[in-house]
A protein has these predicted regions:
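Flavin-dependent oxidoreductase catalytic cores
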Residues: 1-342
Length: 342
């Protein structure tokens, strides 16, 4: 079984280790010095793959917008890491009033609009590749647009995009297929998915396995396993009382059903937990979010066996609270977060 610091080769992309910096919304923006230094610090700290936080897909329809991210991309690459960006499509969570079905203030998206969204993601993937990214991650988790299509709790359509799981996953399948055609091979496509909703009548692991298999057929490279339906959900954002390696068992069930690499996430702080997940074959990659906010050098401190020097996240959730309030995040354990220096 792989070790935490073993290289992972995915097609033409080599990841120097199995550590992923998960996409964490900062409210810093992206095209500025603050974000460049923030992400470069996590790359310098030893993460193998850096995923920039969730960003509206529409921004990446403009090649000039992507080109202005070149300094950030180069800063991460100079530290030896690979870089991707998480793309998402808006819904009522960010004030855009469309959804799979009529709900609250939202109108049901039409078939024509669905195809427009698919084309947007395909174009964005191409522009990201041309702009220097190693890959993109599609945000299909945590109650956002694609998650709403997949979940029976929010998809009440009675056409080819709603009903049984094959229909509810159709949009995701079409989207990944179009992105692969447009971006070509050798460019990483990741999909972040909530494997269970955690509510009666919601998404099941068996359905998530069907999705992972279908996306693999369409050319997906990495399946990123999370859970839950929202920002205030302890499944989506595990708490201090949550199990270490919160979603590892979910990831393991999906990994057993596919051939592509799988990411496990959720309260991984100790080397022993990360090693166990990998050695038990539950995942190929380990994603950390808040722990790498508290200590971006977590990977580098583990490599020489200096785990006692790691600054641990306390899961006080101040960072998430600030994010939800629309303010720049900060960390009670790391006063330098957002104030990184060259």
């Amino acid at each position: 079984m792989p070790g935490l610091f073993d290289i992972l080769k995915i097609k033409d992309v080599d990841l120097r280790n199995r550590i992923v910096f998960a996409p964490v919304v900062t409210n810093f923006g992206l095209r500025n010095e603050q974000s460049l230094l923030y992400y470069a610090e996590r790359a310098k700290g030893g993460a193998g793959l850096i995923i920039l936080h969730a960003t509206p897909v529409d921004l990446f329809l403009k090649p000039e917008w992507v080109r202005r991210l070149k300094p950030l991309i180069e800063a991460v690459r100079e530290q030896g890491a690979r870089i991707a960006v998480q793309l998402w499509h808006g819904n009522e969570l960010n004030g855009e009033r469309v959804a799979p079905s009529v709900q609250g203030p939202c109108l049901a998206i039409t078939r024509e609009e669905i195809q427009m969204v698919v084309r947007k993601f395909a174009t964005a993937a191409l522009h990201c590749r041309q702009g220097g990214f190693d890959g993109v991650e599609i945000h299909g988790a945590h109650g956002y647009f694609l998650n709403q299509f997949f979940s029976p709790l929010t998809n009440q359509r009675n056409d080819e995009y709603g009903g049984g799981v094959e229909k509810r996953m159709r949009m995701a399948v079409e989207l990944v297929s179009a992105m692969r055609r447009e971006a070509g091979e050798g460019f990483l496509l990741l999909y972040r998915h909530s494997a269970v909703d955690g509510e009666p009548g919601g998404t099941t692991v068996a359905e998530s396995i069907q999705l992972a298999r279908a996306l693999e057929v369409q050319g997906l490279d990495i399946f990123d396993v999370s859970a839950g339906r929202g920002q205030k959900d302890s499944l989506s954002i595990p708490e201090s009382s949550s199990l270490e390696g919160t979603h590892a068992d979910l990831a393991g069930r999906i990994k057993a059903a596919v051939s592509i690499p799988v990411i496990a996430v959720g309260r991984v702080q100790r080397r022993a937990v990360a090693d166990r997940i990998l050695q038990e074959g539950k995942a190929d990659l380990i994603a950390l979010g808040r722990q790498l906010l508290a200590d971006p050098f977590w990977p580098e401190k583990l490599r020489p066996d200096k785990e006692e020097d790691v600054v641990l996240c306390t899961y006080c959730d101040v960072c998430s609270r600030e994010m939800r309030a629309g303010r720049p995040i900060f960390c009670t354990q790391n006063p330098n977060l957002g104030r990184e220096k060259r």
